[in-house]
Amino acid sequence: MIRPYTKLKVADNTGVKTIQVIRVLRGPRVAYGTIGDIVVANVREVLPNSDFKKGDVVKAVVVRLAKEIKRPDGTCVKFDDNAAVIIDQLGEPSGTRVFGPVARELREKGYLKIISLAPEVL
């Protein structure tokens, strides 16, 4: 579950390493986010050659959760870390590569570009 002040790894090649969640854009009075939710976050760690600076406010889509996710067919999926992909104003990923596996739930939420860039979909 992703809440405000949660730190997420960034799973793309934008040069940002970690972000800290400010708000989950899921709806009013929703305290947590899950896979496929958009979060507003603050950039915490960056690489020197990045277009982003420390302290920038960005939007990102959650692509991996350490908490197990129960699917309608009865299977449970969980990942080793919490990770997100930074998106632009149109909802497209800012980077050109996605590192690590992503969840199948992204396809249902309409993030086909992230699915196509990912090396593995679980």
From Swiss-Prot:
BP terms from Gene Ontology: translation
Q: Which GO terms describe its cellular component?
A: cytosolic large ribosomal subunit
Identify the Gene3D superfamilies for this entry.
Answer: Ribosomal protein L14
Work out whether the entry's keyword set contains Phosphoprotein.
no
Per UniProt, the keywords (alphabetical) are: Ribonucleoprotein, Ribosomal protein, RNA-binding, rRNA-binding
Q: What GO molecular function terms would the record report?
A: large ribosomal subunit rRNA binding; structural constituent of ribosome
Q: InterPro entries of this UniProt entry?
A: Ribosomal_uL14, Ribosomal_uL14_bac-type, Ribosomal_uL14_CS, Ribosomal_uL14_sf
> Which NCBIfam families does the record cross-reference, listed alphabetically?
rplN_bact
Question: Which PANTHER family does the record match to this protein?
Answer: 50S/60S RIBOSOMAL PROTEIN L14/L23, LARGE RIBOSOMAL SUBUNIT PROTEIN UL14M
Q: What is this protein called?
A: Large ribosomal subunit protein uL14
Q: Which organism is it from?
A: Coprothermobacter proteolyticus (strain ATCC 35245 / DSM 5265 / OCM 4 / BT)
Q: Which gene encodes it?
A: rplN
